[in-house]
Amino acid sequence: MEARLKELKQKALELIEEAKELKGLNDVRVAYLGKKGPITEVLRGMGKLSAEERPRMGALVNEVREAIQTRLEDKIGNLEKAVIEAKLATETIDVTLPGRPVETGCHHPLTAVVEQIEDVFIGMGYEVAEGTEVEKDYYNFEALNLPKDHPARDMQDTFYITEETLLRTHTSSVQARTMEKNKEKGPIKIICPGKVYRRDDDDATHSHQFMQIEGLVIDKNIRMSDLKGTLQVFVKKMFGEDREIRLRPSFFPFTEPSVEMDISCMMCHGKGCGTCKGTGWIEILGAGMVHPNVLEMAGYDSKEYQGFAFGMGAERIAMLKYGVDDIRHFYTNDVRFLQQFKRA
């Protein structure tokens, strides 16, 4: 058996040396080391050996098998290297050809506008607060001075999931939750960006889903002049130093007094044109002083603390800032539209 093993080893190594292709090496591996090969056959016959011969012959079989396996791996490596070198010798790359340009993406215009608005208010000391889009009726309405029988609920058609659960119609619900969670009942200064949902028919100026950004400030001795000054800073940062604002009386259940804010038309600079319908002004947001009932429901003493709030649609701001005439452009995923907003 020992002589046969030496003969197998010598023959296998000779065949490996003679092989010129990977296929030939694979044939040698199968023939000598495969399940039906002579090495395996020798291993099966080990049981017939005496106890004294078995360890020595076992070691010899392993030595022969490892020698064949090692030589196979070396030869395979050499052949693979030779194949690569042959390809490199015959294949060339023309490095003078111009490279293919890589298409770069860009911020969605709504994302860009929301980030700009956040930056403006963060610069004034505000924090960004977020909340759930699926909201309880209480935080969306009742905590904001809108009880179940309040007629102002008709101002917003709502997507109800259950009798007490809905898709939020504004991010004011985040303000209500923030005030309630503030156990110290101290100052608050937040903006609340997020998606909101209303049962509107989609057209050039309306969408059943849109982005809203609301702001809330609660502190002692807060006045209407603080609200006006804050909005003036925001408008000049977003639309330019030459923009003017005006506040008109309005009604919102959660603020008293309530106002709507207009800015001087950027197309005609207040002279009157088709964009502003000849008025020289364009409405962009609603605001007001936080209603005492809202403060009291959140646990604040309305005689000690006051506040102001405001809310705007990100699409409305983006349409005015970029001259977009149809809100649906923001949601159609038209690359031709989106590519206009690539940053240099």
UniProtKB/Swiss-Prot annotation:
Mg(2+) binds at E256. Gene3D superfamilies: Bira Bifunctional Protein, Domain 2 (3.30.930.10). Binds 2 magnesium ions per tetramer. It catalyses: tRNA(Phe) + L-phenylalanine + ATP = L-phenylalanyl-tRNA(Phe) + AMP + diphosphate + H(+). One of its GO terms (biological process) is phenylalanyl-tRNA aminoacylation. Its cofactor is Mg(2+). Its EC number is 6.1.1.20. InterPro entries: aa-tRNA-synth_II, aa-tRNA-synth_II/BPL/LPL, Phe-tRNA-synth_IIc_asu, Phe-tRNA_ligase_II_N, Phe_tRNA_ligase_alpha1_bac, Phenylalanyl-tRNA_Synthase, tRNA-bd_arm. GO terms for molecular function: ATP binding; catalytic activity, acting on a protein; magnesium ion binding; phenylalanine-tRNA ligase activity; transferase activity; tRNA binding. Disulfide bonds: none annotated. It is found in: Cytoplasm. GO terms for cellular component: cytoplasm. Keywords: Aminoacyl-tRNA synthetase, ATP-binding, Cytoplasm, Ligase, Magnesium, Metal-binding, Nucleotide-binding, Protein biosynthesis. It is an enzyme of class 6 (ligase). Tetramer of two alpha and two beta subunits. Belongs to the class-II aminoacyl-tRNA synthetase family. Phe-tRNA synthetase alpha subunit type 1 subfamily. This is Phenylalanine--tRNA ligase alpha subunit. It comes from Bacillus mycoides (strain KBAB4) (Bacillus weihenstephanensis). The lineage of its organism: Bacteria, Bacillati, Bacillota, Bacilli, Bacillales.
